[in-house]
Amino acid sequence: MLSTLRRTLFALLACASFIVHAAAPDEITTAWPVNVGPLNPHLYTPNQMFAQSMVYEPLVKYQADGSVIPWLAKSWTHSEDGKTWTFTLRDDVKFSNGEPFDAEAAAENFRAVLDNRQRHAWLELANQIVDVKALSKTELQITLKSAYYPFLQELALPRPFRFIAPSQFKNHETMNGIKAPIGTGPWILQESKLNQYDVFVRNENYWGEKPAIKKITFNVIPDPTTRAVAFETGDIDLLYGNEGLLPLDTFARFSQNPAYHTQLSQPIETVMLALNTAKAPTNELAVREALNYAVNKKSLIDNALYGTQQVADTLFAPSVPYANLGLKPSQYDPQKAKALLEKAGWTLPAGKDIREKNGQPLRIELSFIGTDALSKSMAEIIQADMRQIGADVSLIGEEESSIYARQRDGRFGMIFHRTWGAPYDPHAFLSSMRVPSHADFQAQQGLADKPLIDKEIGEVLATHDETQRQALYRDILTRLHDEAVYLPISYISMMVVSKPELGNIPYAPIATEIPFEQIKPVKP
């Protein structure tokens, strides 16, 4: 699901990044921590979101200001009640194998996605679509249950509502795999070798503006230090990613070197811990509140993140739509944390440094992706901070798939988590809280008002009334904040390190995409 996404790009932008080496004016070599996967446009891990977006395209394209522009659809209209939408498709688009992209092909893709509707239930649009049909070669009609306000934005997402040539379905479906990743986008996956590389070439028959680059090779390089060394020795010309891009002390050093060009974007998403409200001892509000006061976030960011990110006080940054609510932050205050625990009956026995209640120690597991050195470093700092208030935090480092399984089934006390950035936040991120697709559903299971929160999420996605929408978002986000379900840590920015001759490197409006088509290598 999106988690894969997030941890895929966001452990793939977060757990790595990408590296680019200008082998020639029209060829670059990049690096990624894992292979890009089979590139099924309608499924999740191990498919890498940035690569899905290179090959497959949406009806409408998301922009940095939150709007959408025509893409495979050149125009659209909707009924007065907002439930029936008619899209007029471009008539000059073909899949990279020469098959025509038309309304029939688009409708078949929607059918394939919705035949696997339960898999996509985290995204409300998958639940809202009632019917999709081709009215003609160029007219596509989509009927919804209600006037769903994020409809166009969710059509623009990297997955699942993008289009593969119907000839590449397996047994008329995509839920069990595809034959080959044939899309309409500017890139074609030419070759993959497991644990070694993936090669993309420019789609020479692309209907839109062709990229300047003809070939991109993604070498599989999991280690950030190896990437940094490659850049420093001149083998790599560009690195682009999030906080896992390269060792952050190295980024800080590169930033001081006039021979290198470095960039930090505006904050794009939040890294936090999800606290399990249904599992002792984090089922107690006082414990969750105390843990929020226990972590010295500024020190953590200065030491583990080398000051490259911003302290997070709330689930979403105030810059996120509907999230600038003035919620009171739980700023670092270990004495207040201790007082909360004392009042809740968690006392410190003589001669011990771990609190107990009814003979049980205040012991909490913190789960993280074991191969992510940055998460490990952050976990160790959090562990030390929480020990200062008498909490014994045991660290559970496991492979990525195991951590996501823990998120889905609730086998965690605390677990690293993050929001998804534009265009998912806040609406799609909140929508997913209603199903066990990510850590949020399980983390909230112990809340008495969980049914109300879920009900209000459904209402906020369907209402026409902007005043009601604002009020619902305020209530949902305030409840989650007051219940201390999350321990926000930092607001994450995208990072770029490049040779100055590449100029200013653009950021994609969708955080999980990489704008390779806008990169124009320049000869020295």
From Swiss-Prot:
Gene3D superfamilies reported in the protein's UniProt record: Dipeptide-binding Protein, Domain 3, Periplasmic binding protein-like II
Coiled-coil stretches: none
Keyword Cell cycle: no
Location of this chain's protein in the cell: Periplasm
GO CC terms: ATP-binding cassette (ABC) transporter complex, substrate-binding subunit-containing; membrane; outer membrane-bounded periplasmic space; periplasmic space
Statement: the UniProt record of this protein carries the keyword Transport: yes
Taxonomy, superkingdom: Bacteria
GO molecular-function term, one example from the UniProt record: metal cluster binding
Keywords: Nickel, Periplasm, Signal, Transport
SUPFAM superfamilies for this protein: Periplasmic binding protein-like II
Annotated signal peptide: 1-22
GO BP annotation list: negative chemotaxis; nickel cation import across plasma membrane; nickel cation transport; peptide transport
Transmembrane domains' residue ranges: none
Homology family: Belongs to the bacterial solute-binding protein 5 family.
Job of this protein: Involved in a nickel transport system, probably represents the nickel binder.
PANTHER family (alphabetical): NICKEL-BINDING PERIPLASMIC PROTEIN (PTHR30290:SF37), PERIPLASMIC BINDING COMPONENT OF ABC TRANSPORTER (PTHR30290)
Designated name of the protein: Nickel-binding periplasmic protein
Source organism per UniProt: Escherichia coli (strain K12)
